C-alpha cells in the first residue's frame, strides 16, 4: 500500500502573544484562584500572589543587569518559588533554561557552557553542584539561592516590594523570538539546547490543553528540566487550573493520598513510575474517582503494564502518547472522541495532534521510500509546535529535503491512522526514563590511561529499569587493570544514572564497518548472546 501523509489542522484559538503577555493576562484574569499548592507543607498561593512575586523578581533581575535575550537558568526541585523566576524571565524577554539537580558536574558544566547564563537560580542543596560546574565551564555567572546563603544573593532578597510594581507590564516582542531553551540529547548523542519561540511553546501548550483531558488539578513532581513540566505549567494558566507540587519524587502511598486529598484530575507518569503504582497493594483503599486522565510517555511500555495501570486507575483514561522535546506532544488519543480506541489499541501512541503533519516516510531507512500502512520505517514530521533551531548549533542535518524533522524513531501507522513507535535509530538509550548518551560515558573511559578503545551501550535489564549502561573496552598493551577498577573509575566521574551497572567487558578489538564506523549494535547483540549462552 503506498505511503501517505498523516495530518491535522492547526487550532484557530491560540492567542498571538508572548509568553510574558500570556502569563500576565491570565494571572490577572484568574487572580483569586489558587495557582499551586505544596503538598508537603500544604502552603498555597493564588494567581494574584504569584503574579506579584513574578513582577518583583522581574524588576529585581532588571536591576541586576538582565536584558532581553539574556539566558536565565533555574536548577531546583519544584517548589512554590521555582516558577517565579521562570515567569519573571518571560516578563522581561529573557530566555529561560532549566537544569535538574540530579545531573552530574560533568553534565551540568557542559549544558551551562552551551548557554552561558547571565544568572542562575539554584536550590540551597545544589549550590555546590553549580559552583563546581561554573568553575569547570569557566563561566562567571550571578548566583541566586532559593533558601539561605551568606555568599550569594537569595531569592527572598529579590522578592521585595518595588516602588513601580503596580505600573509594570511585560515587555512586548516578536512571537518568533526565542523564549525557552530545553536541553535534549539529540540524534548525534551530544546534548543540545533546543530553542522554542513564544509562538511554538504557547501553541504546544494549547494543543495539549485541547486534547480532551481535564486539567483542573494537575499533580506535578518533575523539575522544569523536563519539557512536560513546562507544558503543564502553561496549560494550567490557560484556564486558571491549579498544580499540586510534591517535590522531585512521589512514593506510591503519597501518590494515592494526594490524588484522594486534592481531587487530582490529571497526572503524567513516565513508564518507570507506573510500577510503583501497580505494585502498591493498598491502592483500593484510596478514592481515585476524580482522576480523569493518566498520561504515560517518554519511553516504551508494554501492553501488559498498561493494562495493569488501567486496572489500578479504573476510573481514568490511561493514554500512551508520543512526543519530542523539539516539538512537544505529537500523537495521543482524545478521551472525548477516542474512548473505544484507547481500550482497544493498548500500547498505541494515538493519532496526530493539532498542527502536526507526519510521514510514516514513515521512511524506509535504507531506500528513503515513503512506506504505507503497517510498514515500519523512520518517523519524520512537521508541526506548528516545532522548535526554531538548536541554540548556537547547526540543525540542518536533522531535517530532510522537504523540511521534515528526522526523529530517529522507528514506527508505523495502522489502518485507523494510529501511530505505534517500536524502536530507535539513535545510539542513545534510556535507563529509568533518563536519556543515556554513550559518547558522554565513553569520554570518561578514555580518561583512564589503560583504556585504548571503549564502546558504551544499553544492556536490557528489565521492563521497569529499561537498559543499563554497559561498556566493552580494549586495554592498552601491557595494562593490568580489572573490570571492577574501570567501573569504579567511571562511577567517580559520572551521575548515578550513568554508572556502568551492566558491567565492563574486556575485548580484544572493536568491530567496525569497512568505512570505519563502530558496529555498536553488533557489539551489544554479541554480548547479549554470550551472556545467554553462559547462563545456559
Question: Which residues make up each language-model segment?
Answer:
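AMP-binding/adenylate-forming catalytic core of the ANL superfamily
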Residues: 82, 120, 267, 383, ...
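Conserved ATP/PPi-binding loop(s) of AMP-dependent carboxylate-activating enzymes
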Residues: 351-357, 369-398, 418, 434-436
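Conserved AMP-binding/adenylate-forming
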Residues: 40-44, 58-103, 221-223, 435
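Conserved AMP-binding/adenylation subdomain of ANL enzymes
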Residues: 202-217, 225-266, 280
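Conserved AMP-binding A3 loop
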Residues: 44-48, 179-203
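AMP-binding/adenylate-forming catalytic domain of the ANL superfamily
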Residues: 146, 495-517
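Conserved pre-ATP/AMP-binding loop-to-beta segment of ANL
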Residues: 31-32, 150-151, 162-183, 190, ...
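Gly/Ser/Thr-rich phosphate-binding loop
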Residues: 264-269, 278-344, 359
